[in-house]
Amino acid sequence: MTSDALKADPNRLIKIIASLSSTRELLSPEVTKADALEIRLDLITEPIDDALHSLRTSFQGPMVLTVRSSDEGGAYAGGSAGLWKKLEPYIGLVDIIDLEIRFKDHAPQVKEHNKAIIASCHQNRMPDDDEMQALIEELHSFGDIVKIAVQPQTKEDVIRLLKITAACPYPIIMSVTGTVYRYARPLLCLFGSLYTYCYIHSETSPGQYSLREMQLLAHLLSPGFVDPWFEGRPVRSGDASGYYERAEQYRKHLEF
């Protein structure tokens, strides 16, 4: 098992995990535009066996299996034993298991299946620096990748979160909860967060950007990189001439 299962591509600063919450999304052609996929078992209510097997065959990137608890923004209200019963049937079809800090006792079982672990914690508040550092260390103690989502209350909190992310010595996915400071989601990737989570049809967390929106942001914020989605389009990161040319064309078209 490798701890860099979600290692970021150095050619693009923002990489995208599409969070899938329905069979419809598992079968969507849009999944091919994501760098990695998250299967939200706590939100999916239909049978997914066939769809997940098909997705595993067709999708080449990492796949994450998640059962998010209701205490951390998900729909799972059961205990530790029930969590493993939900995970076990599908663990062979994915590369990574997301384990919340409350379920860290399952880490040895995940390791026995030779899967990487995203050790996660989601809080609707902004911890102080000491709390954040202690949380990072605890998550790292059982996970290959640390994942933290918190809720900044001020712009200063956002700046502090960027600094903590940049200074983290471990592989980390840092995110924010809520809509007020949702712009921090792509920015955190510029400061060392491996990935940002997006949706295809339905948000799995308030404040998420859609996959298409994040593709645009990834293009604009990764200097010198042209996402395949933009092939054939005139705009390149750092070059605004295409915008001006297109705007002039529109103005002429609208003249009466």
Swiss-Prot record:
MF-aspect GO terms: 3-dehydroquinate dehydratase activity
Catalysed transformations (reactions): 3-dehydroquinate = 3-dehydroshikimate + H2O
Alphabetical keyword list: Amino-acid biosynthesis, Aromatic amino acid biosynthesis, Lyase, Schiff base
Residues passing through the membrane, by range: none
EC top class named in words: lyase
Pathway(s) of this molecule: Metabolic intermediate biosynthesis; chorismate biosynthesis; chorismate from D-erythrose 4-phosphate and phosphoenolpyruvate: step 3/7
Any Gene Ontology biological process: 3,4-dihydroxybenzoate biosynthetic process
Pfam families with a match to the protein in the record: DHquinase_I
Entry annotated with the keyword Electron transport: no
Keyword Amino-acid biosynthesis (UniProt): yes
EC code(s) of this entry: 4.2.1.10
Active site: 122 (proton donor/acceptor), 147 (schiff-base intermediate with substrate)
Annotated residues for binding of 3-dehydroquinate: 19, 38-40, 68, 185, 204, 208
Family to which this protein belongs: Belongs to the type-I 3-dehydroquinase family.
Function: Involved in the third step of the chorismate pathway, which leads to the biosynthesis of aromatic amino acids. Catalyzes the cis-dehydration of 3-dehydroquinate (DHQ) and introduces the first double bond of the aromatic ring to yield 3-dehydroshikimate.
Assembly notes: Homodimer.
Record-given protein name: 3-dehydroquinate dehydratase
Lineage summary: Archaea, Methanobacteriati, Methanobacteriota, Stenosarchaea group, Methanomicrobia
Gene label: aroD
